[in-house]
Amino acid sequence: MFETLENLLQLIILSVCAAVSLLSALKSRKRPHMLLFFFYLSYLLGDIYWQVCLFYFEETPRISVVSDLSWYAAYLFLYLLIMTEGGNKHKNGRLAACAVKAFPVLMALFYMQWGEILSNIIYALIMGLLFSRITGVLFSKTGKTGGRRLRWLCLTAMIFCLAEYASWTSSCFWDVDALRYTYYADDLLMTLCFPFFIAALKAAPGEADA
């Protein structure tokens, strides 16, 4: 019952965020707002497919490629959004860059015990790119961490991605009650992150954004 309510809450929040970002994109005609809309829309489509399968078949989708493709696209749009806001101007040091890219790879190897190999490889590649840009902005070796809007955007993206990883990890141990509740908490944290992407784009630009 709790899972159903949490999933419904995520669908509602995603729908509202998609509508708000679309209106902002049409009003401002700026690329960041359009990319944010596509991020929401892609994630929403993946969620809808997943929930339809749960509702009609009372089990997770046997053909998960449909939802996976939607979520791949969502993370790529988030990556493009960060790049558009200036994330390509910030880089990690060599050691930090290796550590950031190693994390998604190690997690993918861990998840392969339960999930599809190809899907985990794709997620590792996408998350490696995304984490590189996020940490490059938040922990830039040059000391220039970007403008206020970019920092808030990357901070929200970091929390969102880490919550996603936490929920994936918890789902691997679904039979353990304590970790199952952790999964719900992680998924709820992800849901609550969605509106903050809109708030981040509405933040006044700092010096590095100008």
Predicted regions and their residues:
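Membrane-interface helix caps and helix-loop-helix hairpins in membrane proteins
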Residues: 55-62, 109-121, 173-177
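Hydrophobic alpha-helical transmembrane segments of multi-pass membrane proteins
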Residues: 9-21, 32-56, 67-75, 104-107, ...
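Internal transmembrane alpha-helix with an interfacial aromatic "cap," most often the third helix
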Residues: 17-28, 54-62, 66-100, 108, ...
